[in-house]
Amino acid sequence: MFRQVQKRCWGGAAIIVTDPPFNIGYHYNSYKDKLNEKDYLNLIYNVTEKMNVPYVLIHYPEDLYKIAIHNQKTPTRVCSWVYNSNTAKQHRDIAYFDIKPNFKQVLQPYKNPNDKRIKQRIAEGKLGCKLYDWWNINQIKNVSKEKTEHPCQMPLDVMKNVIGVLPKETIIVDPFMGSGTTGIACKELGYDFIGCEIDEKYFNIAKERLFEEI
C-alpha cells in the first residue's frame, strides 16, 4: 500500500501527517490496538522514517519519546495540544520531524482585542497573531455535531493548526486516516491529500465526510 503512495507522490513534495492508533487498547471496529511494544514501534517506523519524507506525529509525550529514540530522529519542533479531560492524560504532543513549521502561516485571535495597541493592529489589517506552540482546544464530545462513530476522532481545529504551518505546495499523506479529519483540514486549507485506512467502516465515514466538503 505504501509503495503505491510513494509512487503517487514521486516528484511531489510529500509530508506524512498522522494521528496513529495509540496502542492502549481502544476498541476499534476491526483491528487490534494492543501490539507488543517492539511490533508497534516497528509499525510506526515503517510508515514514517522508512518512507524517506518529513513527517508529523501526534501522540502522548512519553510515547513520542520512545518513537523518536526508535527512529533515531530528533524532532525539529514540538507543540502541545491541551484539553479538559476526566482521565489522567490531558494533553498530546505534535512532533515535526525533518520539517520546520512556519507559525506565521496560521493566525490566531488576539487574547486582548480591546487593548489600545491591539485595536491599532486590527485597524492596520493585522487580524491575528502567529500561532503559539501551546493549543487549548476541546476534545470532540459525543453530543458534538462533528462527532462520528470513530472512537478516537481528532478535532478539526487541531488538524488545521498541525497542517497550516506546513509548506503550501505539499501533498499531505495520512497512513491512519480514521474518520478523515486530516483530509478535511487539507481540503479547507488548500493542500493535496492522500489517505489510507484499513477499516472499511471508518474509510466510508471518511469518504462521506470528504465528499461533503467538495
Predicted feature locations:
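Class I S-adenosyl-L-methionine-dependent methyltransferase module
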Residues: 211-214
